[in-house]
Amino acid sequence: TVNLAPADLPKESGRFDLPIALGILAASGQINPEKLAQYEFAGELALSGLLRPVRGALAMAWQGMQAGRSFVLPQENAEQAAVMRGIAVYGARSLGEVAAHLNGIEPLTQTECKLPQRPSEQSKIPDLADVKGQHTARLALEIAAAGGHSLLMMGPPGTGKSMLSQRLPGILPPLTEDELVEVWALRSLLPNHQQQLDSNRPFRSPHHSASSAAMVGGGSDPRPGEISLAHHGVLFLDELPEFDRKVLEVLREPLENGEIHISRAARQAVYPAKFQLVAAMNPCPCGYLGHPSKPCRCTPESIVRYRSKISGPLLDRIDLTIEVPSLSAAELMQQEAGESSAAVLERVTAARKIQYGRQGKVNAELSVSELDGKARIQKEAQEALGTMLEKLSLSARSFHRIMRVARTLA
């Protein structure tokens, strides 16, 4: 009899094949049962006895490390699981190799993984030098990168909003070791779990037709969605008002707390979702409101309806909102390249180093109490800010957003 306890916890995937087979071998006296207590096992078995890769290897390695056990799993998963420090990882090709290891006949070799020291294929990330003009938008992008701030760009079609957003990863520092482990633990839960390790920050750009489940994750067996896959990276939402309003509203919790709670009938899951939101939109349905040469064809009612798709509470959580105007013919024809991503990255890295030295986090993550303690402002600035808050009827959250951005600028 094979018993998978606890019975009330739903089981899925073939990762239990190897533990079940080893239990049978131990019960029949073919391996030493006492050896099993030292290890965690996971792997799908083929009819030939070969081990097939499973998803969730890095997440399982984290649990094994917490339990103080070594981890035996398919060879294809071993390098990924070995990213977790503090646990011995052994990769095996077959059930026979695992049995020989446990019996001391032919020990498995411990897998060591060298963490990537620099982003792989950095040259494939588009360079900011390709962007012509748009000096204000480039500055806003640099400020957002330096402080981890969310950013909304509004402007007519073809002004470079998407182009700028796609270049944000190129001016963000590479993942730290702890961040890399978190990012890859989430990726290991997906079916395409055999991707090559790299330290590039995630960049997710879901289509505006994406459902709530695709955005936050879910299903009968909860899996991370787009916002969790953008953890420690960038979530880019192009054509923001075209997203379903319910989809946009689910962003409010992770933008505030950095995690998402998923509840299903069978189980509940909590996934990290500390991402940097970058969004782009047109000023109106036709896209040409305020364009210097193309007239807008929209009625005032349609413009109001279009913009009302984005709720006030969501807009209140976006730190920076800028207009990206259309370029003149002279700006489009200029031959001189703009400042490169590498040059901007140096300034962003220096700014982040100061922030981590002061407070251990970027300014966008400062709590209200931390702002009150660390971001004191002069009396004259306090009076000017108070006047602006009253004149524009800004909320308390808006006040704190202004303080965070001001601290980054300083």
Each language-model region and where it sits:
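Residues immediately C-terminal
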Residues: 47, 235-236, 242-243, 329
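Hydrophobic anchor at the beta1->P-loop junction of P-loop NTPases
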Residues: 44, 153, 168, 237, ...
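Basic, amphipathic alpha-helical bundle interface domains used for macromolecular binding and assembly
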Residues: 3-12, 222, 245-410
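Walker A/P-loop
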Residues: 152-195, 257
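Walker B catalytic acidic pair
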Residues: 232, 238-240, 250
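P-loop NTPase nucleotide-binding/switch module
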Residues: 106-143, 147, 175-227
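Peripheral, non-AAA+ core regions of ATP-driven protein-machinery
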Residues: 1-152, 156-159, 263
